[in-house]
A protein has these predicted regions:
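Membrane-interface "cap" regions at the ends of multi-pass membrane proteins
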Residues: 4-67, 176-179, 192, 198, ...
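Membrane-water interface regions at transmembrane-helix termini and the short interhelical loops
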Residues: 72-76, 103-104, 148-156, 170-191, ...
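Membrane-interfacial loop-to-helix junctions in multi-pass transporters
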Residues: 10, 47-50, 121-129, 157-166, ...
């Protein structure tokens, strides 16, 4: 079954446009609080644990988490939660192993980027390698988030894919470039509130109510395999968890969050907070996918399950709210990728080799 396009009314579209305008205004507000490079790239190194936790949650709960997990829930069942569960485990491991040392070392060296740490510990050659891989990874990851956001807008509004892509990209690049990490933090707080409201507070109860009215339930009407945690295949699950957890130790945004904390304990506690929050989103996204299998069993693509549920069963007004909840997950991942990629390009390439006096 194809997903209906353009089924949103004026109210839904207005909610989306107000959301985009709000992100731009937050970027402008944050730009007025900039006093130097530290403020721009690492928020003045003074953020509390809740802000750090929000940055972690926002950065890791992106399009691949919400859309991918719900898609796996639709196709495979509860085993689809493994990817986001691995993110939560990664947060815990990183919190106890790396968060405090990174904050302490960055305070001594006064560094801003991950490659700067590499340069101080090893040499310039290794730092350049770290910079190039960081920039390439962030470009690819950011582009993927832009595409995910554009695809959702395209499905639900009927706007052309090109227009949706440009809109998502322009809004994100604008508020990041004007406000830096403070803008990312302010917008991420709003975006995570919207994500929880859209996916957990609104979408889950609406789907539950729809199933109850239809006289069906997950446990009675889904195949038994949908409740097998190993249905994805244990080799795949182990490989996925290992690669996800290890990626925390090589991703520059992990270091940025720790450097931005006001002290070492805050860096650790904030990361633990994120792990708890991530598990809530993992459960909600998997549930939406499994509920979608009963509500809309013949979708052409499991990747469209959240968009399809919004289009087909949600009332107008809530369509827009749930959509911006999902968009928030995508945009909050893209913004930190834009910031950290630009930080590495500026600090580790431009200032190091092209214009050292900048």
């Amino acid at each position: 079954m194809p997903v209906g396009r353009g089924k949103m009314n004026v109210l839904d579209i207005a909610i989306i446009l107000v959301y985009f305008a709000g992100m731009i205004l937050l970027g402008l507000y944050a730009s007025r609080k900039q006093t130097g490079v530290d403020d721009y790239y690492v928020g003045g190194r003074s953020m509390g644990s809740l802000k750090i936790g929000t940055l972690w949650m926002a950065g890791w709960i992106g399009g691949s988490s919400v859309i991918g997990t719900s898609s796996n829930g639709y196709s495979l069942g509860i085993t689809g939660a493994w990817y986001v569960t691995a993110i939560a485990v990664g947060c815990i491991v990183f919190a106890f192993v790396m968060a405090e040392p990174i904050k302490r070392i960055s305070g001594v060296l006064n560094n801003i980027t991950f490659p700067e740490l590499i340069r101080h510990r090893y040499d310039v050659k290794n730092s350049v390698t770290a910079s190039i891989t960081t920039i390439l990874a962030m470009v690819g990851y950011t582009a993927a988030q832009f595409v995910a956001g554009a695809s959702i807008l395209n499905v639900l509004t009927g706007w052309s894919l090109g227009v949706c892509y440009v809109l998502a990209a322009v809004v994100i690049v604008f508020y990041v470039s004007t406000g830096g990490l403070l803008a990312v933090t302010y917008t991420d707080i709003i975006q995570m509130i919207l994500l929880v409201l859209g996916v957990v507070v609104f979408a889950v109860p609406l789907c539950t109510n729809y199933l109850a009215n239809a006289g069906v339930s997950l446990t009675a009407d889904l195949p038994q395999s949908y409740f097998d945690f190993g249905a994805w295949g244990w080799p795949t699950i182990i490989a996925l968890c290992a690669s996800t957890i290890l990626s925390f130790f090589t991703s520059m945004d992990s270091f940025t969050r720790c450097i931005a904390a006001k002290d070492a304990r805050t860096a650790k506690v904030g990361t633990i907070y994120a792990a708890i929050s991530v598990l809530v989103i993992a459960g909600a996204s998997t549930y939406l996918g499994m509920a979608g299998k009963l509500i809309l069993p013949n979708l052409d693509s499991a990747n469209n399950v959240v968009a399809a549920l919004v289009v087909e069963i949600f009332p107008h007004g809530l369509k827009g709210l749930v959509l911006i909840g999902v968009l928030s997950a995508i945009m909050s991942t893209a913004d930190i990728s834009v910031l950290t990629g630009s930080a590495s390009l500026t600090k580790d390439i431009y200032q190091q080799f092209i214009n050292p006096g900048a």
